[in-house]
Every structure is written in structure tokens, then in C-alpha cells.
């Protein structure tokens, strides 16, 4: 019982933090400002053993790895694999900010309203709108994710972290940006991405390249991308 109360308290705390993010969003969105402040001011930590999904008006504990899918109207469908049940919810207020927190030992994936799919690794969280704006597709990431971005020439997709931004039109890539790690990395599977560091220096990657990012320092090298994305398929690669 005490464990249940602790988890629920965590959900409430995270919901309050998200409310502050949403308040900032609604106040500044029309001014064209970025979402960096939302990520920097987000101090919620990931703990417990359940995936937590936070919307504008509720926090839900998902007991198993979850797969979410948003349609173009902002409605979401949640698939809890082990229970094989579906929970549907319709958003009455559009452009809500949602947050998913994935603890150690769990994973989740989301299909956004534009068709982009994101796989979220353990110990990670993502803040995102239920519907992307016509000319703006942005999400905030802490931890490790793999994205398969739906191509839209008129609307780049931007992934923001604490130390760098990634701008793409349509591609597949992996981002590893845990808060406790000294360095972060981006691995490009196919397509093209542009990484911008805190000091505004830019690095453009080609397929099968990785960029290590430590502060404002970057280093690009060629890699076997399968070693960096196998986690999303629950695979562990062993070398002889």
C-alpha cells in the first residue's frame, strides 16, 4: 500500500512539473521561442518500475511496456502488451503537452500524429505535443530514443536535449543523451541530420556516422549502426 502511495505521489509531482511546462508553452508559443527552457526546468526524476504517461489532466501508470498511437485529432490509443487491452482517450484541448517517463527495465514506443515513430529506451523521458503544429514538429528528450521520422519537406522535425538540438526532414537515427552521462551521441541510420550544440556549432551527419557530443566539443566517426540500435528490437549483439 505504501509503495502504491509513493508511485502515485511521483505521478502527481510529475504532473505538476508538466503543468508548469505547459504554462510556459502556452505563454511563449506565439512568440516563436524554443522549448529548451521546458527541459531545463524539468527536474522530475524517473523511478519506480512502471511507465508513467502524463497528460494535461491526468497521470496514468502503465504496468507494462506500452505502445501509444496518436491520430491527427489528438486522440491516443494505448496498447498494454501483457494485458492486451486498449484504452482510448480524446483530447478536448488541442496541442496539449504530454510526457512519458520510462523507468529502468521498461521500454515504450509512440507513433506521433504526423506518423513519426519513436522507440524509448529504459531510464528515459520524452515531452511532446499531442498534435504537431502545421509548421512545427518539436519534442524534448532525456535518455535514449530511436526515431523513424515521417518526411515533410515543409516542416523539419527537431529533437531537443539539454546540450544539443537535432534537425531533420525525414530520416532514422538514434539519440543517447542521459543526464548522468558525460557525453551524448547521435547515430544516423539513413537520411541526413544536423546537430547544433550549445555554442551554435553545427555538425551534419551522413548514414553510418556517429557524433560524440561533450559540452561544445564534437567528434564524428564511422560506425556499425546495428550496434547502437539493436536495443529497440530487444537484441543484444555479441562479438567474438
Where are these regions (language model features)?
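Disordered, charged N-terminal biogenesis/targeting segments of membrane/secreted proteins
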Residues: 1-2
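A residue-level detector for the "anchor" residue at the start of short, highly conserved motifs
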Residues: 5-12, 21-240
